[in-house]
């Protein structure tokens, strides 16, 4: 088909586009931590100091250039107001606004005598309260979304692990790989919960505004460093979060490699490659995460290690490589499925049915291979607008609920798992029935439960409500009469309910007026053949002479 021939070019274009967006993805987030904000301000401060040195040598003016903690102010003219755009490196500022500062006629900047600081008007840089409230509600909704999603995924994956681990018939290499994938999803969810608890996720605009208005940001940046030991737990939480995030991506890659090898590799020995898959899933992510932690502790040991500091590519680049490789495996697998469908269509199959089959298979593969990751990577990266909000909701929805979808595909909708659960359920019901005390007149011979009631013999093979009735040729009006010959049969098990089910002696009634006497002979001595009827109401069967 034409589009199959163009598939390699499409794949190459997507990979190229992904590579072009890698730089924007590595050091950008939907939000920014307070540590990241501080680093950006410190970089601007160092650049400002270089500019101030050059201005002292070249320029002239009354008010000296200086760094006030947020903006690098140039030389000011006496008696005039200087304006500078709101700094773009402050995340929660209105980047279209302008900050003002006044140079007095005596050649000094306006001074706040109470706080011993220069004055600047940043009111235009602050976001409007309604916009701030809207952003806060937006992030709260995102938090609720991914918290619910990861919680549901965690619970469903835990049940799936118990089911596969309980049944020995399900213990095989394929399911072992599934179990490792389930565990990686659970660890990813738990690490996110822990990280949210011990690390500050976002920089609130109110916190930044209070620092600026009180003049504390400059002191906070240039002040002495605090005790780093108090951030040990926070650093461990961040490192474990990054490691479990990376292992989850690589176990998704392992699933793709395993499926791809089953399709394309002849005589593929899954047992032989199991330890190799384990090394890829758990070992390789540990290498680059440890390398990142060492680089971070050596070069930029600040706070909780949530900021990029230019070293995020150490772990982000291998993760993006795993996503890209998995996407290539997905395209190749879909190509093979489509080829098989057209081959079977040539034999005379229904084309619509084949397309539906391809669509179902592709949908399952999208969940298994994590194709949504490459889709979100290829989207333009921005932090505002309706499209960004839609993208954030979709991305967090698929990321958090992917574990739930994977558990459905690999466990709950698996035919082998369903068969084992049904067999266990049937055995459990049979064991419950066997432990129950037999009814009145019931006795067990080996594994068969037999009940003798009003001319009725019940066997377990006949069903719960069916009675096989032996009836004498003559009508009987006596009560339930029990034959005790069963005691001598082999395999007899005495029932505790026999004492309550002993037959009561019933006097024989003789009807002299009609000249007939009730027949007290045993059933086996009847002079006429017996008839078998099905009694569905216990001892209410009627006799019909043949």
Curated annotation (Swiss-Prot):
Annotated signal sequence range: 1-24
Biased composition annotated in UniProt, kind: Polar residues: 496-507
Superkingdom, natural source: Eukaryota
Transmembrane segments: 144-167, 175-194, 236-258, 274-295, 314-334, 362-380, 392-414
Gene Ontology terms for molecular function: G protein-coupled peptide receptor activity; parathyroid hormone receptor activity; peptide hormone binding
Chain residue ranges for the region called Disordered: 496-546
Matches recorded under InterPro entries: GPCR_2, GPCR_2-like_7TM, GPCR_2_extracell_dom_sf, GPCR_2_extracellular_dom, GPCR_2_secretin-like, GPCR_2_secretin-like_CS
Subunit structure: Binds to TIPF39/TIP39.
Record protein name field: Parathyroid hormone 2 receptor
């Amino acid at each position: 088909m034409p589009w199959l021939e163009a598939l390699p070019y499409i794949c190459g274009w997507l990979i190229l586009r992904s590579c072009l967006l890698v730089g924007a993805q590595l050091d950008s987030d939907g939000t920014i931590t307070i540590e990241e904000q501080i680093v950006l301000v410190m970089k601007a401060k160092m650049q400002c100091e270089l500019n101030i040195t050059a201005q002292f040598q070249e320029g002239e003016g009354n008010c000296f250039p200086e760094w006030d903690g947020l903006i690098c102010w140039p030389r000011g003219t006496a008696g005039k107001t200087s304006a500078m755009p709101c700094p773009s490196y402050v995340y929660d500022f209105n980047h279209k606004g302008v900050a003002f500062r006044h140079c007095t006629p005596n050649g000094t900047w306006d001074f706040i005598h109470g706080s011993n600081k220069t004055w600047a008007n940043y009111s235009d840089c602050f976001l409007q309260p309604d916009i701030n409230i809207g952003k806060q509600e937006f992030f709260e909704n995102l938090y609720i979304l991914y918290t619910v999603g990861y919680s549901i995924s965690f619970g469903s994956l835990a049940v799936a692990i118990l089911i596969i681990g309980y049944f020995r018939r399900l213990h095989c290499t394929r399911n072992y790989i599934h179990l490792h994938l389930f565990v990686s999803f659970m660890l990813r969810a738990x690490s996110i919960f822990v990280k949210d608890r011990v690390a500050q996720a976002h920089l609130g605009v109110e916190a930044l505004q209070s620092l600026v208005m009180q003049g504390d940001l400059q002191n906070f940046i240039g002040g002495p460093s605090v005790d780093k030991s108090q951030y040990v737990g926070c650093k461990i939480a961040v490192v474990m979060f990054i490691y479990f995030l990376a292992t989850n991506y690589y176990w998704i890659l392992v699933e793709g490699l395993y499926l791809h090898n089953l399709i394309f590799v002849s005589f593929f020995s899954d047992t032989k490659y199991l330890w190799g898959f384990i090394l890829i899933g758990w070992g390789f992510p540990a290498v680059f995460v440890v390398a990142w932690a060492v680089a971070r502790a050596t070069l930029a040991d600040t706070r909780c290690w949530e900021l990029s500091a230019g070293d995020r590519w150490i772990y982000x680049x291998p993760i993006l490589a795993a996503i890209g490789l998995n996407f290539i495996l997905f395209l190749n697998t879909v190509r093979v499925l489509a080829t098989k469908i057209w081959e079977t269509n040539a034999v005379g199959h229904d084309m619509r049915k084949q397309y539906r089959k391809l669509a179902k298979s592709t949908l399952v593969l999208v969940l298994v291979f994590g194709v949504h990751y490459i889709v979100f990577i290829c989207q333009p990266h921005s932090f505002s607008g309706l499209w960004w909000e839609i993208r954030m909701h979709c991305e967090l929805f698929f990321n958090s609920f992917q574990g739930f979808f994977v558990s459905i595909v690999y466990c709950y909708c698996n035919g082998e798992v369903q068969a084992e659960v049904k067999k266990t359920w049937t055995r459990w019901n049979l064991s419950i029935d066997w432990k129950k005390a037999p009814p009145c007149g019931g006795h067990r011979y080996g594994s068969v439960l037999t009940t003798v009631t009003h001319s009725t013999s019940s066997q377990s093979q006949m069903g719960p409500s069916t009675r096989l009735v032996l009836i004498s040729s003559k009508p009987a009006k006596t009560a339930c009469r029990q034959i005790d010959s069963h005691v001598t049969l082999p395999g007899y098990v005495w029932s505790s309910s026999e004492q309550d089910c002993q037959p009561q002696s019933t006097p024989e009634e003789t009807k002299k007026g009609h000249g007939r006497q009730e027949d007290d002979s045993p059933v086996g001595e009847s002079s006429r053949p017996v008839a078998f009827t099905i009694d569905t109401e216990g001892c209410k069967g009627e006799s019909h002479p043949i």
